[in-house]
A protein has these predicted regions:
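Membrane-interfacial terminal anchoring regions of lipid-handling membrane enzymes
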Residues: 1-333
Length: 333
C-alpha cells in the first residue's frame, strides 16, 4: 500500500520484476500440464527429419523412444498415453495432417499433408519443452562422440539455463542433476549409448532415433553458440545491449544454409534479446551505469567449451570469421 502512488504517475521499483516472475511461473505451469498425444508426438519426429518424410517403422521407433523418455520424469508419468506407438500413429493419421505413401514391399512412408507443415510445427512446439533436457544430452553426446559422464552433466548445466528460459521447460534447478543422470541411464538401458568406466560413447543401435531426438532443439543450440561467439569477441565497455544483439544477428549471417536451414529464428532480434537477459541473470556479462557491457570471461569460456562441439569444425571456423581454403573438407554434422 505504501508503495502505490495515489496519483498513478509512478510505479514501485519492484513491480516489473514481480510481474515478470509471475508471468514466467504461469507459463512454466502451463507447459508442465501440456497434453501428450499421437499428433504432437508424430509431429515432433517427422518435423525433425530431412524433407519431413519418415517410414512407418522409423516413426514407431521414435514414438516408443519418446514415451520412454517421458517416463523418466515422475511428474510426466500421469500424462503419458497408455496406447501403443502404432495406435498413437493411427490416431494421428485420422486427423488428416499426414499422408501415407505405400511404395510396395511393405514399405510405407509418412509425410505432412499439403499445407499442413506450419500447423504440425505448432503441434511439435506444444511439447518440445518436455524433451529439451534429453535432447540437449543427446546433442552433447552425439557431437562429442565420446565424453565423460561428468562433462555431460557440466555442459548440460551450462546450456540448459538458456533452453529453460527460452522454452519455459518445467525442470526445477534442484532436480536438474538427478534428471540428467536418469536420462543418461535410460539412454544406456535402451542402447542409444554405451559406457566404459565413466566414458560415454555413441552406440550404433538406435542411432537414427537418437539423432532425430537431438534435432528438435538443434537450432536453439546453434543460436546459443552464435551468441557466445559474439560475446567472446566483445571488448569490455565497447558496446551496449542493442549493439550486442546486432552483432549476434551479423554473426548468424555467417553460417551456411546447411546449418540454419534458412530458419527465421536466426534473424529474430527478440530471441537474442531473451538470451541477453539470461546472460545478465547468470552473470555472463554485466551492464554498468553507462549502459556498456563487461564480460565475465571465465564463465563465457566455460560456456564456449560446452557449446563449440555442437557445430562442425568447419562451421565453427566460419562462425569465427576465418577464411577457409578449398582443402578444408570437414564433414557437416
Amino acid at each position: 500500500k505504501n508503495d502505490i502512488d495515489p496519483k498513478g504517475t509512478a510505479r514501485p521499483s519492484w513491480l516489473n520484476d514481480i510481474v515478470n516472475q509471475l508471468a514466467h511461473r504461469i507459463i512454466i505451469n502451463l507447459n508442465d500440464s501440456a497434453t501428450i498425444n499421437g499428433i504432437n508426438l508424430c509431429a515432433l519426429a517427422i518435423m525433425n527429419v530431412p524433407d519431413h518424410t519418415m517410414s512407418i517403422s522409423q516413426l514407431e521407433k521414435c514414438i516408443s523412444m519418446y514415451l520412454k523418455i517421458l517416463n523418466v520424469d515422475p511428474r510426466r508419468r500421469a500424462t503419458i498415453p497408455t496406447a501403443s506407438p502404432m495406435t498413437l500413429i493411427r490416431q494421428a493419421m485420422e486427423l488428416k495432417k499426414f499422408r501415407l505413401y505405400d511404395v510396395g514391399d511393405d514399405m510405407k512412408f509418412v509425410r505432412p499433408s499439403y499445407g499442413q507443415t506450419l500447423q504440425l510445427t505448432y503441434f511439435q512446439n506444444n511439447i518440445v519443452h518436455l524433451f529439451a533436457l534429453p535432447a540437449l544430452l543427446a546433442n552433447i553426446i552425439l557431437r562429442n562422440g565420446h565424453i565423460l559422464h561428468e562433462d555431460v552433466r557440466s555442459h548440460a548445466r551450462s546450456l540448459f539455463y538458456f533452453l529453460r528460459h527460452e522454452l519455459f521447460a518445467p525442470v526445477d534447478e534442484k532436480d536438474l542433476d538427478n534428471l540428467i543422470d536418469k536420462h543418461i541411464e535410460n539412454f544406456l538401458n535402451e542402447g542409444y549409448i554405451t559406457r566404459d568406466n565413466d566414458m560415454l560413447f555413441v552406440s550404433g543401435d538406435g542411432y537414427q532415433e537418437f539423432y532425430i531426438l537431438s534435432r528438435c532443439i538443434y537450432h536453439n543450440l546453434v543460436r546459443y553458440l552464435v551468441a557466445v561467439t559474439a560475446l567472446k569477441d566483445t571488448e569490455d565497455g565497447k558496446s551496449d545491449v542493442p549493439e550486442f544483439i546486432e552483432k549476434c544477428l551479423s554473426y548468424s549471417k555467417r553460417l551456411p544454409v546447411e546449418v540454419t536451414n534458412n530458419s527465421p529464428e536466426f534473424a529474430d532480434p527478440i530471441l537474442f534479446k531473451i538470451m541477453c537477459a539470461t546472460f545478465i541473470r547468470h552473470s555472463y556479462f554485466y551492464v554498468k551505469e553507462d549502459g556498456k557491457l563487461y564480460v565475465n570471461e571465465p564463465k563465457v569460456q566455460k560456456l564456449n567449451r560446452a557449446a563449440t562441439p555442437l557445430l562442425g569444425a568447419r562451421d565453427v571456423k566460419i562462425l569465427n570469421g576465418q577464411t577457409l581454403s578449398r582443402k578444408v573438407d570437414d564433414v557437416l554434422f
